């Protein structure tokens, strides 16, 4: 068996990005997962292209920040300001539309590919595998 320690939330902020790079360089973790819709995403992409991140996965998120898809196309996932609902609110909703989740996850994947990232794994948000609309969309994305 092989244990891989992964640093989550690459792209969240520049400070988080620097911490993850430090952990990678120290051998404390082997890979990271990038969030494509966060304030530090562009900085994370630059660090990747500088060779400071050997392996990167995609951290799909539908509970933090703003969607990459126009909010009017994913209304079951966002609040009145166009921000993603937090995980507690989202997981309590009965009317989350699976197709909207799929649309957003695909947008995040395309953004990663368009940024020149070679994605070698992915993770779902907040154990989304236990929430039917996220599980179904994540399985297809």
Model regions: which residues?
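Acidic (Asp/Glu)-rich catalytic clusters
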Residues: 20-26, 42-55, 72-79, 113-114
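Alpha-helical scaffold elements lining the catalytic groove of polysaccharide deacetylases
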Residues: 95-109
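Structural preference for beta-strand elements that scaffold enzyme active sites
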Residues: 2-4, 29-33, 53-59, 118-123
């Amino acid at each position: 068996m092989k244990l891989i320690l992964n640093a989550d939330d690459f792209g969240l902020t520049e400070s988080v990005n620097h911490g993850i790079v430090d952990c990678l360089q120290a051998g404390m973790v082997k890979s990271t997962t990038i969030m494509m819709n966060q304030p530090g995403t562009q900085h994370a992409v630059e660090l990747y292209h500088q060779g400071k991140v050997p392996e990167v996965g995609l951290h799909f998120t539908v509970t933090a920040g703003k969607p990459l898809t126009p909010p009017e196309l994913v209304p079951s996932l966002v609040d009145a300001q166009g921000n993603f609902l937090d995980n507690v609110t989202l997981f309590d909703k009965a009317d989350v539309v699976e197709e909207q989740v799929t649309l957003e996850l695909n947008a995040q994947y395309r953004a990663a590919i368009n940024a020149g990232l070679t994605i070698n794994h992915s993770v779902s948000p907040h154990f989304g595998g236990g929430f039917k609309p996220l599980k179904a969309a994540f399985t297809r994305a």
